[in-house]
C-alpha cells in the first residue's frame, strides 16, 4: 500500500508540473492553461492531469478570505463615486484586436507607415488615444482580455477564468447597458468552444454570440471576413447596441508573412518575426479602415462610438529593437476612442487594462450601475498615473502615494477571491 501510494504521489507530482502557479518572471508569457471546456480537456490531457489542474487552480476560499472580501467590498461601495452625467443612446462598437500593441502605431520603417489609417484617425479632434495601457492578462490570454474589459475584474492568479468560472454570475458592461435598453452582441472568428466563449459570452450578459465568422477562410483572411460578415448583422440590429468584434489575423506565430507583397517585405529588420508581426498589423489596419468606411456608407458611423484596443502583448518592442531585457513599457496596448462625446486631459498617463471597463461605463453614461469595476476612468479629473502589469509589477508617474500603490496591487488578490467564491451570485 505504501509503495502504491508513493507511486501515485510521484505520478501526480510529475504530471502536475505544468499546472503549478506561474512563478516565471513577469516578462515571460504566462502558461496557456486549458483553453477548452472540461470534457475536451479531460479527453486531451487525461483525467488525472485535469483533476490536478482543477485542484491547484480552485482551492476553496477560506473563511478569512471571505471576511477580507466582505470588508473590502463594504469599503469599495463607500469609496466608488457615481460616474459623469453623460447621457446618450449611441451604439458602442468595440474592436478587440489580436496582439495589437501601441509601439506599432505611428511607426515608420524607412518612411513606410505600418498603420496609416490608425495614424490618421488618432489625429482627429473627436478621437481620444491612450497609448500607455498596461495589459493585465494572465493564463487566459485573449479570454482574460474579454473578462477584464467586460467585467472590470482582473484574471485569476492561476488558471483561465473562462474555463474555471464560466458558470459564475458577473457584473458586466452588457448588463449595465441593458439597463439603458441596449442589446449586446459578440462576433468571434473561432469556434465558440475555444476559450469556452460560448459559456462566458452568456455569463457576461451578451444577448447573442456569432462564432466562426472567418467561415472557411485561412487565418490571414479572417479579419476581412469577420468585418464583412458582421456588417449586415449590425445593419439589422436595432439601435442602441453594443457590438464586440474580436479579430484573429494578427495572432502568433509570425513565422511567415500573411501578405507577401507588403512594402514592409523590402525593408530591413533585426528579425523576420518582428517584420511578419508588423505586416499582420498593417493588414489589420487596412481591414479596420474598410470596416469603418462601410459603417459610414451604411449610416452607422455617426451614431456610434468606436473603440479599438489590443487584447495583450505578444511581439514586444524590445524584440523589434533586438533587446533581450523587457520592460513594462515594451508591452503597452492602445485604447482608441472614435467619436468620443467626452474629453480627457489624461491621454499621456499610465492606465491599466482594467481601467477600460470603468472608462466605458463613463463613456456610455452608465452612472447608476452598481459595479464600477476595480479600475479608474480615463475621464477622471485626477488619475493615479499608476498601472500594474502583473501583481507587484507596475509603471508609475513621478509621484504615487503608497495608498494607491497598495490598493492597485491589492486588487489582484481581491479579484482572484471574488472569482473563486462567485461573489456576485448573491446580492450584497
Model-derived segments and their meaning:
Residues 1-90, 107-115, 119-123, 127-129, ...:
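N-terminal secretory/membrane-targeting segments
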